[in-house]
Amino acid sequence: KGSFYHYYSGKDELLASLPEIFDAKYEEVMQALDPEMDSFDKLMTLCFSVHDLIESDIPVGLLASLYSSQVVTKGDKHLLNQNRFYYKMVNQLVDEGQRRGQITRSMPYYEIAHMYALCERAIIYDYCISDGGYALGEYTRKTMPLLFGGVRVKQEVK
């Protein structure tokens, strides 16, 4: 067993804890953000921060196990649990961005929030099937704004 397993009774318990680790990072970053910051930029900053954490602290094999368990599992889908801080935070930020005129209102906030989560998962899935063969944080900084940028409202230059 790897050193990661030392703190857990088994792989299932370890995998179930990963979304909690991600959410703790989201909460930490969220508290440090300027409330006046553009909502789209908040979403990007949160994504970049957690992807940096994943790259530095989470073994890619463990991450791949989490993702594959969510596909084949009939039981708990910890990653997709809508009661997670992550989903509440994303919904809140998209709603805030729509109210501020920073994120399109052409779709309901919950559909845009779902698209955001889908984009994040797509990048992580690619990282897993590439066996962690690239710098996740750097790749996310290039890719996420392109994947999700269509919902951003173009701001007038003052």
Locate predicted features.
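Helix-turn-helix
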Residues: 1-13, 17
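Short beta-strand "wing" residues that participate in macromolecule-binding interfaces
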Residues: 105
